[in-house]
């Protein structure tokens, strides 16, 4: 198993296909996993639309990709996912693009906390509300083109259940629960869209050493950084589950992630039993209300 995983290029040949003539839009493209996904997409001849907050980093990535893959078409949009009004404007703009695949990869873990214009905390807006807005706007066209929307979930979704009296976990202190709550909303709200069952896939990278794992205090991070690199996957290998989601079908409540304890190895499909039908229906109901705020 381990040996096979190290030869992931063979896995790529077997489990992916050309994306020539297709366009992939990806949020959070400048992060560790985002960059690797962009390289994979370009190597499969896809055209790319980058969706990022930091213009300088996005432009640098764009330049790097075009240098390595000069024949692709590449556009960039800049938006802060905390800014709900800006995200709604972006959603309108993207409806004028031809998009076959949308990868909702952007996320934020431990960040300075503040309320957004819709009354919800920024981590909730970044990890759930903004991706949901983009999904709502683009799913009809993606479905019509026979494409896929890939929502990047997290094993953190299982750290707690939703609280209807504290939707965005504003009273909680643990970043893992705040982040996990938002991912729980994202995953189960999209799974509830039965008319898009064949269009929506949820995938997760397991645990990888990226910017999202650098939230620990500097001293602790300095100590654990290198052991983490040995124990967990690098961004390139962690991104394979998300890449695979473009090319496979899943059932409701089935996600794609590393096969060994959900943190290591080649991608596999797994049915989640982490949310009751009653809670899933409540997430669907609340998601529609949140979207309108």
Describe each PLM feature range.
Residues 162-167, 215-219, 257-262:
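Short, flexible, mixed-charge acidic loops at enzyme active sites
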Residues 120, 127, 178, 182, ...:
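Residue-level preference for long, well-ordered alpha-helices that form the structural scaffold
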Residues 2-214, 290-293:
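Rossmann-fold NAD(P)H-dependent dehydrogenase/reductase core
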Residues 87, 226-267, 277:
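C-terminal helical subdomain
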Residues 2-4, 220-221, 250-293:
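C-terminal tail/cap regions
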Residues 192, 241-244, 286:
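Generic recognition of well-ordered alpha-helical segments
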Residues 131, 183-186, 235-238, 280, ...:
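A structural signal for well-ordered alpha-helical scaffolds and beta->alpha junctions
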Residues 209-226:
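A glycine/serine/threonine-rich, flexible loop-to-helix segment
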């Amino acid at each position: 198993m381990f040996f096979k995983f190290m030869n992931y290029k063979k896995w790529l040949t077997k489990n992916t296909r050309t994306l020539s003539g297709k366009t992939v839009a990806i949020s959070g493209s400048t992060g560790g996993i985002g960059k690797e996904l962009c390289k994979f997409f370009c190597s499969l001849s896809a055209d790319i639309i980058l969706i990022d907050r930091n213009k300088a980093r996005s432009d640098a990535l764009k330049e790097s990709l075009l240098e390595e893959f000069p024949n692709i078409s590449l556009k960039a949009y800049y938006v802060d996912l905390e800014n709900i009004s800006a995200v709604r404007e972006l959603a309108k703009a993207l409806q004028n693009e031809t998009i076959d695949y949308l990868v909702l990869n952007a996320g934020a873990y431990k960040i300075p906390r503040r309320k957004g214009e819709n009354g919800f905390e920024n981590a909730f807006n970044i990890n759930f509300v903004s991706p949901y807005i983009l999904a709502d706007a683009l799913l009809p066209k993606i479905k019509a083109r026979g494409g896929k929307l890939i929502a990047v979930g997290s094993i953190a979704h299982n750290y707690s259940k939703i609280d209807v009296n504290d939707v965005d976990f504003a009273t909680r202190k643990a970043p893992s629960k705040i982040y996990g709550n938002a991912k729980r909303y994202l995953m189960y709200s999209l799974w509830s869209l039965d008319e898009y069952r064949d269009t929506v896939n949820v995938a997760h990278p397991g645990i990888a050493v990226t910017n999202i794992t650098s939230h620990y205090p500097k001293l602790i991070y300095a100590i654990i950084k290198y052991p983490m690199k040995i124990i967990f996957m690098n961004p390139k290998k962690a991104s394979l589950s998300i890449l695979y989601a473009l090319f496979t079908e899943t059932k409701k409540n089935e996600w794609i992630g590393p096969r060994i304890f959900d943190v290591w190895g080649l991608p596999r499909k797994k049915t989640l039993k982490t949310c009751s039908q009653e809670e899933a229906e409540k997430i669907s109901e609340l998601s529609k209300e949140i979207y309108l705020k």
